[in-house]
Amino acid sequence: MAKPKFIALALVALSFLSIAQSIPFTEKDLASEDSLWNLYEKWRTHHTVARDLDEKNRRFNVFKENVKFIHEFNQKKDAPYKLALNKFGDMTNQEFRSKYAGSKIQHHRSQRGIQKNTGSFMYENVGSLPAASIDWRAKGAVTGVKDQGQCGSCWAFSTIASVEGINQIKTGELVSLSEQELVDCDTSYNEGCNGGLMDYAFEFIQKNGITTEDSYPYAEQDGTCASNLLNSPVVSIDGHQDVPANNENALMQAVANQPISVSIEASGYGFQFYSEGVFTGRCGTELDHGVAIVGYGATRDGTKYWIVKNSWGEEWGESGYIRMQRGISDKRGKCGIAMEASYPIKTSANPKNSSTRDEL
């Protein structure tokens, strides 16, 4: 039977950087077909996008609609977040959904009859209240933003971000680990570029360990498992747990202790072109994308947010991150962020022969 397809100051600086990496435009650029065409050519040059003439004409029509949407949204004076003309500029939302947010995590979990949150939650009885804010980037537990490309491997990037985090917290060493090993080798239930689940990936790493990004670099496609590297793990974990579902307080308690893997619905226009600010936009709970929460905080006006590390490259969002509204009335959280959270457990030392001195 075929397996189912799953699937502070620093922030200010990140905001400016995200703007610099997108293509700015003004009313003048929207004034005519010629000016819009010139903007499209500028966008294509910036992103080195090659198109034949027929495809270019078709994509130009998509581009115009996207520019109009971004412009009209950014005219809203009270919007707490902004959109930008990023690398998805001539892609329809349907194409974006299928290529970057196509892992129906919740649907495929239910297909397999998997029940969440049947085990314990190690942070449930932590005595002290979590800090008002935390940023694991500032604590040195987060590697640079990576890019999954047009491969549905978000589940691998989410998993690796959490494992990189707990490894740094426990060992003091930040090591960039291999998503490609999961894509190629974790194939019992996960399906590489066709999607997967973070819990399965945690189980794989618990059994096999994981090697470094440098040793097993990302290829943006499914490949044959490199068994020699599979047998030479650098980092290990001892298990994983799920955060109690639909409970942002429990999620906050977990994030206060380590980066956490979560699933969200990320397929809307607001996500496609998100640039900066706290995302409060429209989204549902059809979980289709795996990411990692690496902190939380609040703006000066009191808007609470999660700091979320994405895997769409540094140009998207706040240099690859998005701040998502926290503490909303829906217990499932913004875009379902509190529905499917999990994290690795590490109590043992890494394999003795491993060398965790890796480039970042």
From Swiss-Prot:
Which E.C. number(s) belong to this protein?
Answer: 3.4.22.-
Q: Can you tell me which residues are glycosylated? A: 353
Q: Which N-terminal stretch is annotated as signal sequence?
A: 1-20
- Position of motif Prevents secretion from ER? 357-360
Q: Where in the cell is it found?
A: Endoplasmic reticulum lumen
- Cystine pairs annotated here are 151-193, 185-225, 283-335
> GO annotations under biological process?
proteolysis
Q: Which residues form a coiled coil?
A: none
- Keyword Aminoacyl-tRNA synthetase part of the UniProt annotation: no
* Highest taxon above the source species: Eukaryota
Q: Which PROSITE patterns match?
A: ER_TARGET, THIOL_PROTEASE_ASN, THIOL_PROTEASE_CYS, THIOL_PROTEASE_HIS
Q: Which residues form the propeptide?
A: 21-133
Q: Does the keyword Nucleotidyltransferase apply?
A: no
**Catalytic residues of the enzyme:** 154, 289, 310
Recorded family membership: Belongs to the peptidase C1 family.
PANTHER family per record = CYSTEINE PROTEASE FAMILY C1-RELATED
Q: What is this protein called?
A: Thiol protease SEN102
Organism annotation: Hemerocallis sp.
- What phylogenetic lineage does the species belong to? Eukaryota, Viridiplantae, Streptophyta, Embryophyta, Tracheophyta
